[in-house]
Every structure is written in structure tokens, then in C-alpha cells.
A protein has these predicted regions:
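Non-catalytic substrate-recognition and accessory regions of acyl/acetyltransferase enzymes
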Residues: 2-160
């Protein structure tokens, strides 16, 4: 019961993302990579990497592949991207990741509305819950789709 009360309290506190910094933009041909970072309430530095494919094969349009991790976690990719911060602010972290994604859309395309799909890397059951929350943070028209291989994407039905 306490966990539910803590989650409900957190939902009420998560409308504002943490302040974040765009660390780097690297463009090459039809692709780009943006790196952001921010500190959560435990002062863990979270790194957000957005790999951009301007003409995705699967969805035929700009696709963002998003990974985020605690910078103090392991160098092992599987461990790093599966690590929880245990700071009790997961929805605020997701809100900040979405703010980074919106900023990346603005930086590269003028608006998040021009992005066709967003793919989050991660195999944790939490990601489905996080994606539902992320979907609410985006403009209307974004849906959650599962494609072959188990990848879960947010897809923008407003783009052509």
C-alpha cells in the first residue's frame, strides 16, 4: 500500500522535468546523435542518448532511438541500461527524457511533430508503463506499437 501511495504522490510531482543540458550534437549524412545529461534528486547524473535515423526503414520517416542510464553505473551495456536509480523519481526521470526528446526534435526538425517514431532501448517490464506515461507527455496522435523482435515504439500517426 505504501508503494502505491508513493507512486501517486510522485505522479503529482512529475509534471516538471529536471533541468537538463544538451552536451553534444553530432550529424553525419542522414543520421545524428544527441547527448543530454541531468541530475536526479539523489544527484545521480543521468545520460540520455538519442540516435536519429532521418529515414527509418521500418516506419519510413525520422526515428529516434533513445537510451538513458545512470552515469555512475557499470560500463557493461546490459547492466548500465538495466540499472534502476532507486531514487523514487522514475516518472520525473521519464518526463525529463521526454523533454530531451522534444528538444532533439526541435533542434533537428523544428518540432517533435515531424518525428515518425521513438524507440526506447530496454527489455524491462517497467518500460511498458514508462511508455504509457511518455505517450501522455507527447502531443495527441502518438501510439504504442510492438514490432518484430519485441521492440516497443511510440509511433506518430500525424506524419505522412
Amino acid at each position: 500500500m505504501i508503494k502505491l501511495i508513493e507512486l501517486l504522490k510522485e505522479i503529482g510531482e512529475t509534471t516538471e522535468p529536471y533541468p537538463f543540458t544538451l552536451e553534444a550534437i553530432k550529424k553525419r549524412g542522414d543520421s545524428a546523435r544527441l547527448v543530454y545529461h541531468f541530475d536526479n534528486k539523489n544527484e545521480d547524473t543521468i545520460k540520455v542518448e538519442i540516435a536519429v535515423d532521418m529515414d527509418s526503414y521500418y516506419y519510413k520517416g525520422p526515428e529516434f532511438t533513445v537510451t538513458f542510464s545512470d552515469m555512475t553505473s557499470s560500463d557493461d551495456e546490459d547492466v548500465k541500461y538495466g540499472t534502476m536509480t532507486n531514487s523514487g523519481d522514475s516518472l520525473k526521470v521519464i518526463s525529463t527524457v521526454i523533454a530531451c526528446i522534444k528538444d532533439a526534435g526541435k533542434q533537428l526538425l523544428g518540432s517533435i511533430d515531424k518525428v515518425k517514431s521513438i524507440n526506447f532501448k530496454g527489455d524491462d517490464k517497467r518500460f511498458k508503463i514508462y511508455l504509457r506515461y511518455a505517450q501522455k507527455q507527447l502531443p495527441s496522435g502518438w501510439s504504442i506499437e510492438t514490432r518484430e523482435g519485441g521492440n516497443i515504439d511510440l509511433v506518430n500517426s500525424n506524419t505522412q
